[in-house]
Design a protein with these regions (language model features):
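Domain-terminus/edge residues, biased toward the C-terminal soluble/receptor-binding domains
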Residues: 1-182
Length: 182
């Protein structure tokens, strides 16, 4: 025996917002009308959590307004992919003079469009980096700044760098003291 029934969906985003694909609406006397919603446009996903609204209509209006605001006023900026080469840094007393540094993770930031022009990206590394250095050692940071925000992401060594032998270290240290370089 097969039962059929019609179930209306109360999530206003699903039928009135392009890219909406979920989640849940709810209502209680204590919390009012609420919604947890999700939408994706152009490869960017936004999540929305609302609660405490007085009517289902205000829930619908506010959820649409906030989703539109999020997609219209923020831009996703991609900086580096996980494992992508970022910079070479000098080493101290290493068998190689430089070590390649890469991003530990994908670095993508959703930034208010009004701050795109004043955004600043810096690579923070204290050089020279003492050896030995092992692959995946955190040896620096990528810092993204805009407005009053500073976001930092780890930079990892992409290779192993062994320390020079004893006599080579002494020679390099003397050379550094006299000429100021490794």
């Amino acid at each position: 025996m097969l039962f059929r029934s019609k179930q209306d969906n109360r999530n206003p985003l699903l039928y009135s917002f392009e890219g909406a694909d979920g989640f849940k609406t709810g209502h209680t006397q204590a919390a009012g009308y609420g919604l947890v919603g999700s939408a994706e446009r152009g490869g960017r996903r936004l999540l929305l959590v609302l609660n405490g609204l007085e009517t289902s209509r205000s829930r619908a209006q506010e959820s649409l307004r906030l989703m539109e605001w999020g997609f219209n006023n923020f831009q996703l900026v991609d900086f580096y992919k996980q494992g992508e080469f970022v910079i070479e840094a000098s080493t101290w007393l290493g068998k190689q003079e430089k070590v390649k540094l890469s991003s530990q993770q994908d670095i993508s930031v959703s930034i208010p469009k009004t701050h795109i022009s004043d955004m600043k990206v810096e690579v923070l590394v204290e050089e020279p980096i003492p050896t030995p250095i092992s692959i995946n050692d955190q040896v620096g940071l990528v810092q993204i700044s805009y407005a009053d925000k500073k976001l930092q992401y780890p930079l990892l060594a992409s290779e192993n760098i062994e320390q020079k032998g004893f006599f080579s270290r002494i020679t390099s240290a003397l050379y550094y003291l006299v000429l100021g370089s490794n």
